[in-house]
Amino acid sequence: MTIRTPNELRVAVYDRFWSVAGGGETYAGSIAEILSLDHRVDLIAHEPIDVGTLQERLGLDLSRVRVVVVDDCEPIERVSRAYDLLINATYRDLSPNGARRGISIVHFPHLPTEHLAPWQLRLMGLLHRVARRSIGPVEFDSGFHPADIIRWQQVRWSNGRGVLRVAITPTTTRNLRIAVARFFPDRTDRLVRVKVDGVDVTSFTVVAARNRLQMLRPQIVTVPVTGARGGSIVELLSETFMPDEISGNGDRRRLGIPVVWAGTGAGPISRLLETVSLLGAPRRGFPWLDSYDRIVANSGYGAMWVQRLWNRRCEVLVPAVSQRTGGEKRPIILSVGRFFAPERGHSKKQLEMVGAFARLSAQFPDWELHLVGGCTEQDQPYLDAVRRAAAGLPVVFHIGATGEELDALYSTASIYWHATGLDEDLDADPERAEHFGITTVEAMSAGAVPIVMRAGGQLEIVREGIDGYFFADAEGLLARTRQVIDDDALRGRLGESSVERAKVFDRDSFARRLRIMVDEVLR
């Protein structure tokens, strides 16, 4: 295999969610920024990106990178074949690598079959073996996104014009049976037109699921298809929606209908398979990972769970963290993180922090709690609940704060709180812990004393009693905070140590580790 000299290498950095411009995108963008000094780097995106705007939001220099926009439904494996190295930094992406070399960035590992019991996994394996012989020769030709997992079904969302190619003996007519999942986030029914070889033949309505049973049982549609040379073309035409417009989750794909499977099989076995949604569940294993040369997590915590869940070796590349400037400290406790309810992910626990601060405020009335973070329309009820809990307390909200405002808060804050993972069963759901803790490092770099949850990536940042403290519950949070507030000398010593500790995670350290890793992969 021929690899070009370093200044000729082509590198692709793929992130489906560039427009979100969150922590994951900052991580991916930092990789692109550094590698662009030595290589030709493209950002692979699914919609146009204004590089100037993106680099401003991420706080990076992306002037040397190029943006390559590809269709949502174009397989990344195919797109990446033109590159020497693919770095796939998309959250929960199952795309195989097509480049000469590949690095998979795992923000946190997941199991495609994590919701299945052992008996369901065994049944699933049996069904897949039977299905290969029973559902007939049908392929997803174009207009379908890579596989997604909905509950325990694997589906292929169309983009509004999904094309199936059906291999049937010419002039022979058979019934094509299509299983369509009924999950639509807005619970709106969908009208679908069907064309066969360019001719309108029928239409049907996918009735959105109203309960759990309907969610698990796909809707079966039958379409008569007459064989043609090279295969018959079946088009599924529907209106589309964008998930981000409904749930604010950053998913800006245009989605039509979710197809579980399609086949031309007949007889009792095929009928049985149609009633079992497990047929659409993903197979066990992680075949897409085999196409990558390295698996990389942003913390030792993530790497540990890659080993436990995937049984794969994983390297650690901690994020590059912007170093802030400290100033004159005020009686401020700061916490930075997006506002969203626990049921929507690893919540930053602002509601619990306000509850703890209410008890603290009576003893230390001069101290303030400042909460910084964004909030989508969908998460507004949670923010409203936090505001109600904070009524009458010296709690200041900074929703959508500017970079300058955040810098000023870091500069003056004396203590930094981070409570992600509080009151969670992290053995059962480890993703609810903080995977690393970029904001903790940012606050430390400005001299704030971190008092953070004893879980996840925080354990790799803070040194107990040297830079700050850990807590396991609300009582521990209050006890450590009182200790730091009461002792000015202790607070000063911990703050000075925090500044030095934060330098371990600066950009130069990140760049050095990244270059070593890439050189090893390309060697």
Predicted feature locations:
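Active-site donor-binding segments of glycosyltransferases and PAPS-dependent sulfotransferases
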Residues: 38-95, 175, 186, 191, ...
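Nucleotide-activated donor-binding/catalytic signature segment of Leloir-type glycosyltransferases, i.e.
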Residues: 59-62, 373, 383-407
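Membrane-proximal helix-turn-helix segments that form the acceptor-binding/catalytic region
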Residues: 121-134, 268-295
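Conserved catalytic-core segment of nucleotide-activated headgroup transferases in glycan assembly
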Residues: 262, 308-309, 321-324, 329-391
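Acidic donor-binding loop of glycosyltransferase active sites
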Residues: 411-435, 448
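Short acidic/histidine- and often glycine-rich active-site loop of Leloir-type glycosyltransferases
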Residues: 427, 451-465, 469-470
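Short hydrophobic beta-strand element within catalytic cores of glycosyltransferases
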Residues: 440-452
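Conserved acidic donor-binding segment of nucleotide-sugar-dependent glycosyltransferases
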Residues: 464-475, 483-489
